[in-house]
A protein has these predicted regions:
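Structural signature of tandem alpha-helical TPR/SEL1-like repeats
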Residues: 46-56, 80-93, 114-124
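Conserved structural position within tetratricopeptide repeats
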Residues: 58-62, 92-96, 127-130
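Juxtacatalytic substrate-recognition/specificity segment
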Residues: 154-265, 276-285, 291-298, 302-311, ...
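Pan-zinc metallopeptidase signature
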Residues: 302-376
Length: 376
């Protein structure tokens, strides 16, 4: 399953900073020009046009190098473009210019977290929490990173050209190698299916069942999660099993989808993950879907766009079934090429409705009606 997370969690506070730019005093002509570029960059960030946003913030700084908001925006855009050293310089400069703002430290924490430097990430988030003590999300994030660091600080590592796996104890070396082999297979197969191969190393962390629950707070029905890293509870893995292969393909698909777009409705994300793991809808499930469709009780797909994390066992079972059913209908009716186009449209900032209309060339409503009719 995918755990909902946002690498652009700082955007709201950044928008407030931009809105207040220059509001407290009269601006020079150059500062006014800088604010115009600043607001353009803000709009480009909102629609995930990171390179264009970076260019706009750099233009703003040519007119006003003392703008904390422009340095912050440039740091955020560069963070998303994975230009980490440049992002860090801009974020540190933003913190110097506006020492009461927690946002630069928040993004720096995300940057070091992505680099797997958990100790440095925690240090930056501690600074952010000190500046924004009422930010519950920040405090929660800091507590989780502390749990991760305590749990993983002595883990072993193994790598391939595409993956880094972390695990505790030499007895899990073979388990790590089995998992890496399966993930390399997934890299090829899912890549061929979606015509997309991520070019950045993906981390995979293997936990005991207790460690998994402590670090992730995942629901009991979850066999693994993807939250920027693949996290899996494992027992004594000694050989590949069909269940392990399905689980790894499922979570790896989430990583691929996330790499294409940070904005994917959960029904589409979970449906694709089940599709690529090879999950089939069995005869009992087909009967259940038909019965629900005949009764007119299939949910609106818009109701399945948010996280499934808070669902109970039965609710989650049906949410996943509806997700797989709708995605299989989409692939069978329009082809995987159109599904990939839909994901790319979402990656450009389109909402689900616009993404579907641009991707598969019919409206969200028409797609949903077609899916529901196919089950009757």
């Amino acid at each position: 399953m995918q755990k909902m997370f946002r690498a652009d969690i700082v955007l709201v506070s950044f928008l407030l900073l931009v809105a207040g730019a220059g509001a407290s005093h009269a601006l020079t002509a150059e500062q006014n020009t800088a604010v115009r570029f600043l607001k353009t960059g803000m709009e480009q960030l909102k629609v995930v046009e990171y390179q264009a946003a970076r260019d706009s913030f750099e233009q703003a700084l040519r007119y006003d190098d003392s703008s904390a908001a422009a340095h912050l925006g440039l740091g955020i855009a560069s963070f998303h473009l994975h230009d980490d050293s440049y992002a860090e310089r801009q974020l540190m400069r933003a913190a110097e210019l506006n020492p009461r703002d927690a946002t630069p430290y928040q993004v720096l924490g995300e940057l070091y977290y992505r680099k797997d430097d958990l100790e440095s990430a925690a240090s930056f988030w501690e600074k952010a929490v000190a500046l924004a003590p009422d930010a519950a999300d920040l405090r929660s994030r800091l507590e989780r990173i502390r749990k991760e660091h305590r749990t993983e600080k002595d883990f072993n590592r193994d790598v391939t050209s595409h993956f880094l796996v972390k695990y505790e104890g030499r007895e899990k070396i073979e388990a790590g190698r089995i998992i890496l082999r399966i993930l390399e297979d997934a890299y090829g197969e899912v890549g061929r299916g979606l015509s997309y191969y991520p070019d950045r190393e993906l981390q995979v962390i293997l936990y005991s069942g207790r460690q998994f629950q402590e670090v992730t707070d995942a629901p009991g029905w979850s066999g693994g999660i993807y939250d920027g890293k693949i996290r899996i509870p494992i027992g004594g893995i000694e050989q590949e099993t069909p269940g392990l292969r399905k689980l790894l393909y499922h979570e790896y698909t989430h990583a691929v989808v996330r790499s294409i777009t940070p904005r994917c409705p959960t029904w589409l994300n979970e449906g694709l993950a089940q599709y690529f793991e090879g999950h089939e809808i069995d005869s009992r499930q087909k009967v259940a879907l038909n019965r629900i469709a005949q009764a007119g009780k299939l949910p609106a797909l818009s109701d399945l766009e948010g996280s499934f994390m808070g669902l109970g066992n039965s609710q989650a079972m049906y949410a996943y079934l509806f997700s797989l059913s709708s995605v299989r209908y989409m692939v069978d009716s329009f082809g995987m090429y159109r599904v990939k186009t839909l994901l790319e449209e979402l990656g450009k900032g389109a909402d689900t409705g616009k993404g579907i209309s641009n991707g598969i060339m019919i409206s969200y409503e028409e797609f949903e009606r077609g899916w529901k009719r196919s089950l009757e």
